[in-house]
C-alpha cells in the first residue's frame, strides 16, 4: 500500500505528477485556504503533508495525524510550523530554498525601483486620464524620485536571498552594506560587501532591504527607534516577514517623513488590509508574491516532491530543516 500525502493547495502539476508515481495523492481543490477544521480531518490518515505558509502546523495538527511522518513546506520560510514539536515527535520538516532565491531577489528590486521612481503613482496618473486632463505633455517636476545608481544599499540578512540582492546591486554600481548574525568573509570578498552593525547600516544606507527569517530575535527588529536612524531620503523594502517591522512605527515614519518611502510584500497578518497604510502614496504594496514566477513555483513543486520521495526511500530529504530529527527517527514510512 502506497503512503498517502495530502497537499493543502494545488501546486504545479510537475510536482504532483512526480508524487503520484510514489504516493496516493489528495489535493485540496479550492482556491481559498483550507479551513482549520477540514485540515484536522484530512490529516487523520496521511503519512505526509504538503503545506503552504498560510497553514499553522502545530501540536493540534500533529495530535490529529497519528501516521504523519513528514511535513514538506511549500516555502523557504517555515515559521508557520512548530519545528521543535515536530522534532520531538520524530516528524521531518522540509522547505524549498534556492529554487526561489532569484525570483525573490528580482522582486526586491522591483519594489525598490518602483518605490524610488514613484512608478505606481505615475501609472495611476496616466491610467486615470489625469495626464490627458492636465493637457501638459511633460513637466520638469512631475514624479521626482530618487537615484539608485551609485547609492548605498543596506541588506539586513545575508543568506541566499540577501546575497542575490547584493549581486544585482553591483550592476547598479552601489556600495553594499550588510548586517547578519555572523560575518560572511567569502561573500564580502565576492560581492565587495561591508559588514555593519544594524544601527550603522540604517544610518548609512539610501536603501534598506530586509531579507531575514522571522525569529524571536528578528521580530519587530525594525521599530520606531531604528526607523528614526534612517535617512529622510531612505527607502525601506521588506521581502522577509511582516512581523520583522513594527507597522505602526512604519506608518508614522512614512506620514511624518522620517523616511522617503517603503516597498512591502509582507505584512503582520495575511491577508491584510490597513486603510491608513494603504492610503499613503509613498508606499508600494504587493500581496506576498516575491517568489511568484512560473519557474520558481515549478522549482518549488519539484523540490517538495524530491524531499518526499527521498524520505520514502529511506534517505534524508535534501532540504531537511530539523536535522536533529534523524536522531529521533530514521527516514521512511
Curated annotation (Swiss-Prot):
<dbReference type="InterPro" id="IPR029752">
    <property type="entry name" value="D-isomer_DH_CS1"/>
</dbReference>
<feature type="active site">
    <location>
        <position position="270"/>
    </location>
</feature>
<dbReference type="InterPro" id="IPR050223">
    <property type="entry name" value="D-isomer_2-hydroxyacid_DH"/>
</dbReference>
<comment type="subunit">
    <text>Homodimer.</text>
</comment>
<feature type="binding site">
    <location>
        <begin position="288"/>
        <end position="290"/>
    </location>
    <ligand>
        <name>NADP(+)</name>
    </ligand>
</feature>
<dbReference type="GO" id="GO:0005829">
    <property type="term" value="C:cytosol"/>
</dbReference>
<feature type="active site" description="Proton donor">
    <location>
        <position position="288"/>
    </location>
</feature>
<feature type="binding site">
    <location>
        <begin position="158"/>
        <end position="161"/>
    </location>
    <ligand>
        <name>NADP(+)</name>
    </ligand>
</feature>
<dbReference type="Pfam" id="PF02826">
    <property type="entry name" value="2-Hacid_dh_C"/>
</dbReference>
<dbReference type="InterPro" id="IPR029753">
    <property type="entry name" value="D-isomer_DH_CS"/>
</dbReference>
<dbReference type="GO" id="GO:0030267">
    <property type="term" value="F:glyoxylate reductase (NADPH) activity"/>
</dbReference>
<keyword id="KW-0520">NAD</keyword>
<dbReference type="InterPro" id="IPR036291">
    <property type="entry name" value="NAD(P)-bd_dom_sf"/>
</dbReference>
<dbReference type="InterPro" id="IPR023519">
    <property type="entry name" value="Glyoxylate_reductase_GyaR"/>
</dbReference>
<dbReference type="GO" id="GO:0016618">
    <property type="term" value="F:hydroxypyruvate reductase [NAD(P)H] activity"/>
</dbReference>
<dbReference type="InterPro" id="IPR006139">
    <property type="entry name" value="D-isomer_2_OHA_DH_cat_dom"/>
</dbReference>
<keyword id="KW-0963">Cytoplasm</keyword>
<keyword id="KW-0560">Oxidoreductase</keyword>
<dbReference type="InterPro" id="IPR006140">
    <property type="entry name" value="D-isomer_DH_NAD-bd"/>
</dbReference>
<feature type="binding site">
    <location>
        <begin position="239"/>
        <end position="241"/>
    </location>
    <ligand>
        <name>NADP(+)</name>
    </ligand>
</feature>
<comment type="similarity">
    <text>Belongs to the D-isomer specific 2-hydroxyacid dehydrogenase family. GyaR subfamily.</text>
</comment>
<feature type="binding site">
    <location>
        <begin position="180"/>
        <end position="182"/>
    </location>
    <ligand>
        <name>NADP(+)</name>
    </ligand>
</feature>
<feature type="active site">
    <location>
        <position position="241"/>
    </location>
</feature>
<dbReference type="Pfam" id="PF00389">
    <property type="entry name" value="2-Hacid_dh"/>
</dbReference>
<dbReference type="GO" id="GO:0051287">
    <property type="term" value="F:NAD binding"/>
</dbReference>
<protein>
    <recommendedName>
        <fullName>Glyoxylate reductase</fullName>
        <ecNumber>1.1.1.26</ecNumber>
    </recommendedName>
</protein>
<dbReference type="GO" id="GO:0047964">
    <property type="term" value="F:glyoxylate reductase (NADH) activity"/>
</dbReference>
Amino acid at each position: 500500500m502506497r503512503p498517502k500525502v495530502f497537499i493543502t493547495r494545488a501546486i504545479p502539476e510537475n510536482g504532483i505528477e512526480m508524487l503520484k508515481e510514489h504516493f496516493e495523492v489528495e489535493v485540496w481543490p479550492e482556491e481559498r485556504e483550507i479551513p482549520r477544521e477540514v485540515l484536522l480531518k484530512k490529516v487523520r490518515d496521511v503519512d505526509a503533508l504538503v503545506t503552504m505558509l498560510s497553514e499553522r502546523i502545530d501540536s493540534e495538527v500533529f495530535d490529529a495525524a497519528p501516521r504523519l511522518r513528514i511535513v514538506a513546506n511549500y516555502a523557504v520560510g517555515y515559521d508557520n510550523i512548530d519545528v521543535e514539536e515536530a522534532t520531538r515527535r520524530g516528524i521531518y520538516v522540509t522547505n524549498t530554498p534556492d529554487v526561489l532565491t532569484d525570483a525573490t531577489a528580482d522582486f526586491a528590486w522591483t519594489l525598490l525601483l518602483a518605490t524610488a521612481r514613484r512608478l505606481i503613482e505615475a501609472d495611476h496618473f496616466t491610467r486615470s486620464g489625469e495626464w490627458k486632463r492636465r493637457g501638459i505633455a511633460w513637466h520638469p517636476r512631475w514624479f521626482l524620485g530618487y537615484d539608485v545608481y551609485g547609492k548605498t544599499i543596506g541588506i539586513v540578512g545575508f543568506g541566499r536571498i540577501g546575497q542575490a540582492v547584493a549581486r544585482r546591486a553591483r550592476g547598479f554600481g552601489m556600495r553594499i552594506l550588510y548586517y547578519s548574525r555572523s560575518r560572511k568573509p567569502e561573500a564580502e570578498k565576492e560581492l565587495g560587501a561591508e559588514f555593519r552593525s544594524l544601527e550603522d547600516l540604517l544610518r548609512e544606507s539610501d536603501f534598506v532591504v530586509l531579507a531575514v527569517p522571522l525569529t524571536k530575535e528578528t521580530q519587530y527588529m525594525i521599530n520606531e527607534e531604528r526607523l528614526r536612524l534612517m535617512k529622510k531620503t531612505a527607502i525601506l523594502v521588506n521581502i522577509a516577514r511582516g512581523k520583522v517591522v513594527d507597522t505602526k512605527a512604519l506608518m508614522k515614519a512614512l506620514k511624518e517623513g522620517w523616511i522617503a518611502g517603503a516597498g512591502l510584500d509582507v505584512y503582520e497578518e495575511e491577508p491584510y488590509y490597513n486603510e491608513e497604510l494603504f492610503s499613503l502614496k509613498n508606499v508600494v504594496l504587493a500581496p506576498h508574491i516575491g517568489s511568484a514566477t512560473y519557474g520558481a513555483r515549478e522549482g518549488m513543486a519539484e523540490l517538495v516532491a524530491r524531499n518526499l520521495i527521498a524520505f520514502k526511500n529511506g534517505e534524508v530529504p535534501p532540504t531537511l530543516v530539523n536535522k536533529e530529527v534523524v536522531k529521533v527517527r530514521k527516514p521512511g514510512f
